[in-house]
Amino acid sequence: MSVGAEYAVKMHHVTKTFGKVTANKDVNLELRTGEILALLGENGSGKTTLMNMLSGIYFPDHGEIYVKGKEVTIRSPKDSFALGIGMIHQHFKLVDVLTAAENIVLGLDGKVTVNRREINKKVGELAQKYGFDLDPSKKVYNMSVSEKQTVEILKVLYKGADILILDEPTAVLTPQETERLFTVLRNMKKDGKSIIIITHKLNEVLAISDRVAILRKGEYIGVVNTAETDQAQLTEMMVGRPISLEIDRPQVERGEKRLQVIDLTCLNGDGVKALDNVSFEAYGGEILGIAGIAGSGQRELCETIAGLYPSIGGSVLYSGEHDGVPVQERILGL
């Protein structure tokens, strides 16, 4: 059986269960050729599970999948790649000691040239075509998170994918890196690529997508044209009820100073500086948020404060009942 080829992908009545848990229930999803479709939903709504079936990681219990007008059976990532589908996951699958270009050609079927200069040239041309900023000869362990993501995207493009799935691609990016990624995605769309972005960030959905498909608790709620919707409507479709996006926060009455971090510096497990002269104070009766993209030192900060991670400079002091006592001594009762 076949369906209209104007759709790059059609998923009909797809269901996936894990034991007694239903991750996706009778889901219908359509991706048009040459569009950017946002797949929107709360955490746990089944977005990634649905796309894992399209990329061959999971196999649906029920339902049909059509790619470029033909019904297909996708039992593995190899089947998915053969259909021109490539998925970029949240957690990168790169070999740190290899270069960008080496990672991109790693695992390719057939005869692959071992001429590094030729490989670097081809990867560089592909990166330039879509507007990526990447040195093909750079080792992965020297790359930023954004550069590693670029390598993952180029990997699927190099294999010939024209249907791309990006799982929470901006979760680890700065606002500037996010805007650069969106520019690249628009260039890919102009080149005829069909793109699905899994996300729950409403502002980014409205900025980059052509249409928005919404999942809620594993079920398909509907699809809307991005130009005809707003954050309020999308939120209601995600949650199932109207939600006020305006938060009225009362003024906090701070108590005594409880924690003082002074010029704290530490290295991560790879010997790279994770914290560099970090200073702040926390007061009783308040909730202090620590913000930053993944890998910015939040984990090392919390573990150092708790005495689980050594510092190479600075101090962490408990203030209050025993003013000026190091936190580690306070925890140990010294």
Give the location of each predicted region.
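Glycine-rich phosphate-binding loops of nucleotide-dependent enzymes
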Residues: 2-334
